[in-house]
């Protein structure tokens, strides 16, 4: 079951991000996914604006899997400026939430900056009691 969660997350993220390689080929967008026992990390790459023959790596998505309590925590989600305003991050969170829900896992976004926290609360994510930098994604969270 544990390996299945890793595989489901990897497949979901990969199939979602794959079309963006074509959409952003001028920016040389690419990504790689690494799994380890308790997490998945997606590294993105795009053309270095100062050295066009090189790419700049960035952490696109980092999540931890807490198998014992059936939770997944997203601690990092980042998109370069040229990928903003297309709801890419929201849809990726929604896709991950969908597969986790089917497996009986809960999804949390943690270590949030205040502005993102407020946005997610406004979108219907549940605040975590006693914590002002984490929310739980639920069915009623607006991720469109």
Whereabouts are the PLM-identified features?
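Non-catalytic substrate-recognition and accessory regions of acyl/acetyltransferase enzymes
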Residues: 1-84, 91-144
């Amino acid at each position: 079951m544990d390996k299945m969660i890793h595989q489901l997350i990897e497949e979901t993220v990969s199939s979602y991000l794959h079309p963006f390689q074509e959409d952003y080929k001028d920016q040389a967008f690419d990504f790689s996914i690494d799994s380890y026992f308790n997490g998945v990390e997606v590294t993105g790459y795009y053309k270095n604006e100062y050295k066009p023959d090189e790419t700049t790596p960035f952490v696109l998505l980092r999540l931890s899997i807490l198998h014992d309590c059936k939770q997944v925590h997203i601690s990092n989600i980042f998109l370069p400026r040229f990928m903003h305003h297309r709801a890419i991050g929201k849809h990726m969170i929604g896709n991950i939430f969908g597969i986790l829900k089917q497996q009986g896992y809960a999804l949390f976004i943690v270590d949030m900056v205040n502005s993102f926290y407020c946005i997610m609360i406004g979108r219907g994510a549940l605040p975590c009691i006693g914590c002002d930098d984490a929310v739980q994604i639920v069915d009623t969270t607006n991720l469109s």
